[in-house]
Amino acid sequence: VEFAPRLMPVQLDADGGALLRHKIEELGVQVHTEKATTAITEGEDARLRMNFSDESFLETDLIVFSAGIRPQDALARASGLEIGERGGIVIDNHCTTSDPHVHAIGECALWEQKIFGLVAPGYTMARTLSAALNGDQETAFTGADMSTKLKLLGVDVGSIGDAHAQTPGARNIRFNDEQAGHYRRMVISEDGKTLLGAILVGDNSHYDTLLQYALNGITLPENPETL
């Protein structure tokens, strides 16, 4: 059951989400998108009933919640540190809070209105803070690569950089092999020289190559679609 219009909406576009849904449903798993649960009550044909805002419902014997993260900022809030509107301890580029003697890293820290729900940004913050505590004010936290590579119920899924082409002038190259069940989208710069992001579903064999092009700013070949 997914609240958004598609699965993994942050990582995938509409085409990638549709293919992922198709592959999961082929495994015999029902997928319900655009469903907002309003109440969980006792079921008639199963133990539980999930009631949705569109007045439909789903009965099941077991419900497993996977609802993201919530920053644990109670101590910081009680101590008078600056807290974001939706939670999280506000930090600067050196992981320092509103009190110069207090620092925060990881999923409790709010950097430029962003909470990072992955472990990699926490490691980057830790390195930044370690450098700052050792007198290095040149090293700064400037964000983190949120690229993702995983298997979802056995289905390869990959997302790199600006996967939704939000960069001004960005162009798209799409490959959609319906028979093989492979989808790949490459987001490139307006001049065609830089890979800005990518989406892969069904086949991650190109992921590592595309990731290196995106992270290291490697100039794309004349025909990027050959990657």
Which residues make up each language-model segment?
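A Rossmann-like FAD-binding core segment of flavoenzymes
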Residues: V1-V90
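Generic alpha-helical structural signal
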Residues: A18-R21, Y123, R127, D208-L211
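Generic secondary-structure signature for well-ordered alpha-helical cores
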Residues: E25, V29-Q30, L81, A131-T139, ...
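A short, glycine/Asx- and small/polar-enriched loop/turn
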Residues: E42-L48, S98-P100, L152-L153
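FAD-site-proximal beta/loop scaffold in flavoenzymes
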Residues: R49-N51, S56-A131, E222-T226
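Short beta-strand-to-turn element immediately C-terminal to the catalytic PLP-Schiff-base lysine
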Residues: R77, S189, V201-G202, Y213-N216
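Mid-to-C-terminal Rossmann-like scaffold of FAD/NAD(P)H-dependent oxidoreductases
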Residues: C108-N204
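A short, polar/charged loop-to-alpha-helix boundary motif
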Residues: N204-E222
